[in-house]
């Protein structure tokens, strides 16, 4: 970022002064690294677009990425719901499957409700994202749609993962089942590209402006 604003440059990852540092993560299935730049010089010919005019494009890319991540979160919700329904239908306690207990049914119903609402949010956000890429009439609503989807889907994914872990019980923490992997993914993806609080504040600022 310079006096003219934010600029976007092409940078060879093997350039002098560029280093990548591996970061330990809660979600072991999603690798992350910190990019360190020390005294790195980039020629003006590697500038993408006009100097200081990169933020609109970067903002759009971040919104599109948030929509994509929210879609992944909805997929995680559905998978957790499916696994939980299957497990509770097989797990027997007191000579009956635990799925037959009303409290378990209520918990599963709550999981389904949050999953379906999250699905509705991502369907709309995906539609707006497509319109943005095609220059359609909804292109101007990408920021709002992405924040709605990311905020709700983040909260729903973590809540559904927590409920699933509760219904699986202690076995959900073992490597024999994938529930704990989804729980870790839910928590890590919640904070990636902004958590629910960040996006709700952004949405409120946009709507009240």
Model-flagged regions — what are they?
Residues 19-20, 45-46, 78:
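Short helix/loop capping segments that flank catalytic or ligand/cofactor-binding pockets
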Residues 9, 35-37, 77, 118:
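Residue-level signal for inorganic ion chemistry
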Residues 1-19:
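A short core secondary-structure module
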Residues 2-5, 43-53, 130-140:
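Short, glycine- and charge-enriched coil/turn segments that flank and shape catalytic ligand pockets
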Residues 1, 22-27:
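A generic local secondary-structure boundary/capping motif
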Residues 12-14, 25-61, 82, 196, ...:
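Internal glycine-rich alpha/beta core junctions
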